[in-house]
Amino acid sequence: MKAADVRSKSVDQLSDELVKLKKEQFNLRFQAATGQLEKTGRVTEVRRDIARVKTILREKSQAGK
């Protein structure tokens, strides 16, 4: 996910995206623990996407003040 794509979304969309990414991260963690995870790089990718979304949400909340 590109930062430009994240910035173009509304706060509600970003919140929904954050929930979706956290669920995916949870599932990936379980797959890794049970040895079923094939794409190990996806864990890092999802973690960074979560950080990106949180950063943009914080920027948008600070801009509103």
From Swiss-Prot:
InterPro entries assigned to the protein according to its UniProt record, in alphabetical order: Ribosomal_protein_uL29, Ribosomal_uL29, Ribosomal_uL29_sf
SUPFAM superfamilies hit by this protein: Ribosomal protein L29 (L29p) (SSF46561)
GO terms for cellular component: cytosolic large ribosomal subunit
Keyword Ribosomal protein assigned: yes
Disulphide-bridged cysteine pairs: none
Keyword annotations of the record: Ribonucleoprotein, Ribosomal protein
Any Pfam family the entry gives: Ribosomal_L29
An annotated Gene Ontology molecular function: structural constituent of ribosome
Keyword Ribonucleoprotein: yes
One biological process term in Gene Ontology: translation
Family to which the UniProt record says this protein belongs: Belongs to the universal ribosomal protein uL29 family.
PANTHER family linked to this entry: 60S RIBOSOMAL PROTEIN L35/50S RIBOSOMAL PROTEIN L29, LARGE RIBOSOMAL SUBUNIT PROTEIN UL29C
HAMAP family xrefs: Ribosomal_uL29
Protein name, per record: Large ribosomal subunit protein uL29
GN (gene name): rpmC
